[in-house]
């Protein structure tokens, strides 16, 4: 119930017209990055919105060509209590905070004269991890999650698509892949044996 208004606002976000037109055609990448960091996002990256990863049911809904990839850190202490209700609160609580911050960032992008469509973390439109890899924010780990050099897998992800003039970031090899090949902790400890020992296919 608490996240419903955030999800509903995200669904219509792409239809909202900017209150002004862009003052110039200059690149606004760093303006958006600084604003996002100021709001509290720990990771911010820019890349092409790759429609290959969009769910079929959302392909007509997704409007804009650029993806702003955003990650919000999840509380470390609470996360270490998994499995517990405390850890669940950390998980969903971070999504709730992220949803509200996304609305603020979208509002800022519109104030620059551009459209912004929120791909709500509570209403995913596709697979986000490949775009986060392309934006240089991490790599796919053996656990099937995005591993960031700053947060590990302890981050919640969302994307805002836009038509703003931005410059794309580049993929970075953080060495996560090689580390996963030798670590194997998640593979060996997975209760359901759902993870494989073989090399993980990856991009970036």
Kindly give the residue locations of the regions a language model identified.
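Catalytic cores of enzyme domains
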Residues: 42-204
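Iron-sulfur (Fe-S) cluster-binding modules
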Residues: 1-46
């Amino acid at each position: 119930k608490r996240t419903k208004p955030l999800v509903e606002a995200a669904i219509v976000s792409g239809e909202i017209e900017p209150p002004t037109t862009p003052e110039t055609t200059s690149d606004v990448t760093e303006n958006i990055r600084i604003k996002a960091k100021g709001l509290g996002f720990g990771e911010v990256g820019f890349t092409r919105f790759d429609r290959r990863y969009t769910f079929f049911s959302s392909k007509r809904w997704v409007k804009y060509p650029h993806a702003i990839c955003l990650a919000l850190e999840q509380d470390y202490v609470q996360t270490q209590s998994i499995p517990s209700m405390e850890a669940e609160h950390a998980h969903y609580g971070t999504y709730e905070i992220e949803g509200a911050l996304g609305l603020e960032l979208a509002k800022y992008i519109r104030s620059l004269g551009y459209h912004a469509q929120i791909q709500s973390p509570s209403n995913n439109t596709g697979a986000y991890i490949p775009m986060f890899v392309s934006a240089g924010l991490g790599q796919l780990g053996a656990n099937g999650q995005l591993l960031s050099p700053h947060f590990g897998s302890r981050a919640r992800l969302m994307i805002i698509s836009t038509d703003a003039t931005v410059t794309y970031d580049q993929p970075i090899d953080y060495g996560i892949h090689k580390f996963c090949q030798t670590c194997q902790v998640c593979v060996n400890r997975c209760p359901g044996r759902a993870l494989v020992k073989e090399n993980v296919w990856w991009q970036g």
